[in-house]
Every structure is written in structure tokens, then in C-alpha cells.
Amino acid sequence: MTDFSFACTGVRADRYAAGPTLVFRLRVTAAAGARVHALALRCQIRIEPARRAYGAAEADGLSDLFGERSRWGSTLQPVQFAQVALMVPSFTGEIETDLVVPCTYDMDVAATRYLTALTDGEVPLLMLFSGTAFTGDGGFQVEPVPWDREAAFRMPVTTWREMIEQHFPGCGWIRLPRDTMDALLAYRSRHALTSWEATLKALLGDDGGGNGDGGDDGVLAPPARDPFRALTGSTGRTDP
């Protein structure tokens, strides 16, 4: 059976993609210069948080994921980042190819929350490979790529931030249930608010002059049947 090894040699943000996308440069090596007709790969990418240090601000941002820093010895577990498929074309011995990984800025996804909390340095990644190889010099042979094939890589945090800024410059992104979105739309229309930023600031009582729906202390006190109750109901939070 052909022995395969994998290495990640770099990563870049794809500035021409329709959505946030990272492109990892992958080197695939077949032992003894074996002839490979094609390689159908499955790649699982994990973040390994325990393989880097964190500043105080980063630790605060990660508390929702891993709890208090004193507990990190047991809670700093791997986080799933992506799972993608790749078809590698014919090669002999060694080849380099691109592994395209679509990403999300959904703050409900653990990997996104982790990456957003980082201020600098590198993201420790582990790529796990499996799949099917079609090999043979004078014929055609089908072989499995065993599950123990892997490659470690440290992705610069700046690459992630560059990718996000290309698609969401200066912005964040959250996912809401449809009924909550309908409630927000109704609230925005009823109060003739010109933007989503203004809508959320009004709900938070952050209009700068104390004239919005918030009280004197800046805390929102929604009236009966106000759409904000739909927000608190969908998120599991209690009303002020």
C-alpha cells in the first residue's frame, strides 16, 4: 500500500471569493515516487487551543467557550473548524495543490468566536486526512488513505482578520431566528429608524440622550407586546 504524507506550507485569504474563504497550500507526498492517478481526500481541520498562549484580553474573550482561566487545564479542548473534500489530480512522487475552505462569521459557531477573540499571534491547526487513492504504474489499483494521516499548521491571526475585513469591513455578524428578525423589522418600521445600528442602539437604550426606549440608567424597559420580548424569548435572556 502506498504511504502518503501531508504538509501545509501556507495559507491566504481568497479576495475574489463570493464569501469568506481561506486557501491552504497543501503538499502531498507518495513514498518511493509512486504513480498516483488521482486522490480523493477528506480533510477535517481542528483548532487546538492548548497549543498557544493567551493574553488577558484574549482570555476574557474566550471565557464563554472555555470558562474561567483556572479551569483551562480540562476545558481547553479541540474546536472543529472545517470539513472539506479535495480531489487531487494525477502526480508522481509529490504535488502541491490548493485546499479551499469556506468560512463563516457566524458568532454562534465556536470556531468563529475563538478566532474573533484572538488579537495576534497564530492559530494552531491540525489537519486530519483520509480518503481513497487510485495508484499503479502499469495498471489501476484502489487504496485507502488511512485516518492517521495528519499535518499541523499555525495560521497567522492576521490572515483570518484580512479575510473577514474583505467581506465584512468594520462589521460583525449575528444569526437570528425568523420570528426575531420579523420583530426587529416591525420595531424599526414603527420607530422610523434608518439603519440596523440605530435599531439596536434604540433597543439597548444607547441613543446618547436618554430619549429612546431605555430608562435614565440606559437599561431598556420594553412596553407590553414590544418586539424586544421576542428577542429575549429567542435568546433565553430575561427582560430587564
Regions found by a protein language model. Name each.
Residues 1-23:
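Low-complexity, acidic Ser/Thr/Pro/Gly-rich terminal tails and inter-domain linkers that flank the onset
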Residues 31-39, 193:
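A short beta-turn/strand-edge loop motif at beta-sheet boundaries
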Residues 41-48, 96-148:
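Internal, hydrophobic beta-strand segments that form the core of beta-sheet-rich folds
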Residues 46-57:
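Short aromatic-acidic-glycine turn motif
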Residues 60-69, 134-173:
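Short beta-strand elements
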Residues 61-116:
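Extended, solvent-exposed segments with strong compositional bias
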Residues 178-195:
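Surface-exposed, Lys/Arg-rich phosphate-binding patches that contact polyanionic backbones
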Residues 194-225:
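Short, basic amphipathic alpha-helical segments that act as recognition/interaction helices
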